Amino acid sequence: MKFLDQAKIFVKSGDGGAGCCSFRREKHIEFGGPDGGDGGRGGDVILECVANLNTLIDYRYQQHFKAKIGNHGQGRNKTGGKGDDVILKVPVGTQVLDEEKETVLADLTSAGQTMVLLRGGDGGFGNMHYKSSTNQAPRRADEGWPGEERWIWLRLKMIADAGLVGLPNAGKSTFLAAVTRARPKIADYPFTTLHPNLGVVTLGEEEFVIADIPGLIEGAHEGAGIGDRFLGHIERCRVLLHLIDGTQDDVAEAYRVVRHELAAYGGGLDEKPEVVALNKCDSLTADDIELKLMELSEACGQEVLPLSGVSGVGLKPILARLFTHIREAREAEPAVPAASPIFGSSKRGAPTFQQRKRKLQAEDDEFAGGHWGADGEWIWHSADNDGDEVDEDYDDEDLEEVADDEEDDAEE
């Protein structure tokens, strides 16, 4: 399966169904009155996090997703059915960003987590809502409210406990294959790994996930090589395993290059706990191993462990140290409260069902001087002094202007 870790898509929730204008027609009932039902709500756009996906490739060839419109109302006070939802299935670790990639709208980190991204539009009122003592046969019915729409970015950040970093050909994929059942591509040339790979390490009765990303080179944060695009996949890691190729002449410089790229990327990668290992020790003499371990320890300021992914030397001590950091990080993490299952981009021009109902009642009020209705930030005026219907929404500034005008009229 091809790997894709980001995709731009267009989503639209369904429009509300139209209200119905109808009248009761039955034998021996001369004046049945209105019985038009309301339209149904439009379908929602829902994100669902599933465990059996590890790529966003499904969104490469289809970028537009639209929920269904709500069903129209019918006679006999029948409310239209809700439109079908659009359910977008994404891998664990998917983030939702706005079109400019500046704001994270949602972060799905556990399988089974769902989130309503866009709500469907409300259905229109049927003529039953307009019945009053003075208008017993209204012929007015509303269209449904439009749904919401927007462009969004989906960005995948894999969920792993430990992340492998290092220069190309440092032996990261070989190490992953040696400690897990993952089978990444392994070859003797740079950038063999072109996308992240995950593997599960079993250590006694404990398990943790380790991620292998493409190698970094000097200037990766400026786009050199594959760049630092895949560093986002280790942002969630609790510890980093930094592998250094022991066959290089200057192992200290190799360490500093990668550390510089981690710091330049940001995201707190350079502040994460780190385990440093000198890899490919099977190709070195005992004196060379001792000398390079000393040079590397001075550069990183901590003990460096010898390792050979091919022969298996040093694997258990490294895994034990990684799990020690992982266990400490797990214990230190605060309990995360359950995320709200509902997320939506609110529309300022779309009042709630109760607000709309109050507005309709205000419009039918027979008060000669007009009637003001207020609910939170919504303020409506139903009729002007001539009794003509006015359908306007006012905010706080508009209300202050109206009050000032009334004071001026009173002074005159």
From Swiss-Prot:
GO terms for molecular function: GTP binding; GTPase activity; magnesium ion binding. InterPro entries: G_OBG, GTP-bd, GTP-bd_Obg/CgtA, GTP1-OBG_CS, GTP1_OBG_dom, GTP1_OBG_dom_sf, OBG_GTPase, P-loop_NTPase. It is found in: Cytoplasm. Signal peptide: none annotated. Its cofactor is Mg(2+). Its main location: cytoplasm. GTP binds at residues 166-173, 191-195, 212-215, 279-282, 308-310. It comes from the Bacteria. Residues 385-412 have a biased composition (Acidic residues). Gene3D superfamilies: GTP1/OBG domain, P-loop containing nucleotide triphosphate hydrolases. Its EC number is 3.6.5.-. It is an enzyme of class 3 (hydrolase). An essential GTPase which binds GTP, GDP and possibly (p)ppGpp with moderate affinity, with high nucleotide exchange rates and a fairly low GTP hydrolysis rate. Plays a role in control of the cell cycle, stress response, ribosome biogenesis and in those bacteria that undergo differentiation, in morphogenesis control. Belongs to the TRAFAC class OBG-HflX-like GTPase superfamily. OBG GTPase family. NCBIfam families: Obg_CgtA, PRK12297.1, PRK12299.1. Monomer. This is GTPase Obg.
